[in-house]
A protein has these predicted regions:
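Intrinsically disordered, low-complexity terminal regions
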Residues: 1-270
Length: 270
């Protein structure tokens, strides 16, 4: 009997030790997986960035504010204890912004404010939101693979944007020649401005709201459940293979429609 009591008492002591150790570990990591090194106070930290950078890759839950300016600069903003985890690595003309380790929970978002002379490509992975403005040039490639949203305001002749995640894209473009959109995930696109041509391939569930993007020629291919709302001045070439609907504004004189799915095509009277 005494042996059983000793065993039971030993198990209780062991359980208390384990609970205490676990609580200590969680306390050391603030319960959310972040080490308690440094203060929770907000802090800004200047990072180096070269003039040759024109390609940005954003990974993780980091918000990005990117604007055009003659002199490149970069500032990381967040809780002091977390800033060392924000990694900014430049290789040639490519700057990668990412976290060294994953974080379970952020009380306040991490943010990077970046100024560059030119921009050719932006790739977004993860949940960070991006606001981009002031850039112009010949060609822009924009790729979104995560849940982060992107707002882009600029002037490029050729724009190619692809969405394969759940993040939404807001495009404001001035006097472009062609805009090409590829939509595979659940993310939606809102587009405004002017372009000679607009082509869009909708293969996911995300919607395209481009009735404020005035294009001379529009080519829309719907293979998913997403709906498209567009504006065509001269011609509209529409191919519906999915369940998504297409609504065309602008009363274009040249119209070509192919329907193999359950989606409908309508022509707005405006």
């Amino acid at each position: 009997m005494q042996t059983l009591l000793k065993i039971g008492l030993g198990m209780v002591v062991l359980a208390v030790i384990l609970v205490g150790t676990t609580f200590g570990v969680l306390r050391a990591h603030d319960i959310d997986g972040t080490a308690r090194n440094g203060s929770r106070a907000m802090k800004s930290e200047t990072r180096k960035v070269g003039t040759e950078v024109n390609i940005i890759i954003l990974n993780g839950p980091i918000d990005l504010t990117l604007k055009q300016g003659a002199t490149p600069s970069m500032v990381a903003i967040g809780e002091e204890r977390l800033l060392p985890r924000v990694q900014t690595v430049q290789e040639g003309n490519t700057l990668t912004i990412a976290l060294k380790e994953s974080l379970f929970h952020l009380n306040r978002p991490l943010r990077v404010e970046l100024t560059l002379p030119t921009l050719q490509q932006l790739t977004v992975h993860g949940s960070g939101d991006s606001a981009v403005g002031g850039f112009s040039g010949d060609a822009l490639v924009l790729a979104m693979h995560g849940s982060g949203d992107v707002r882009f305001d600029g002037a490029y002749r050729h724009v190619h944007a692809s969405l394969s995640g759940s993040g939404d894209l807001e495009l404001a473009l001035a006097n472009g020649e062609d805009v090409d959109l590829s939509m595979l995930g659940s993310g939606s696109v809102t587009a405004s401005g002017q372009s000679k041509s607009l082509s869009a391939h909708l293969m996911g569930s995300g919607d395209l709201a481009a009735e404020k993007m005035q294009a001379d020629a529009v080519a829309i291919d719907v293979m998913g459940s997403g709906d498209a709302n567009v504006y065509a001045k001269q011609s509209a070439t529409l191919d519906v293979k999915g369940s998504g609907d297409i609504d065309v504004h602008g009363n274009p004189p040249h119209r070509q429609v192919s329907r193999m799915g359950s989606g409908d095509v309508s022509w707005a009277k405006d």
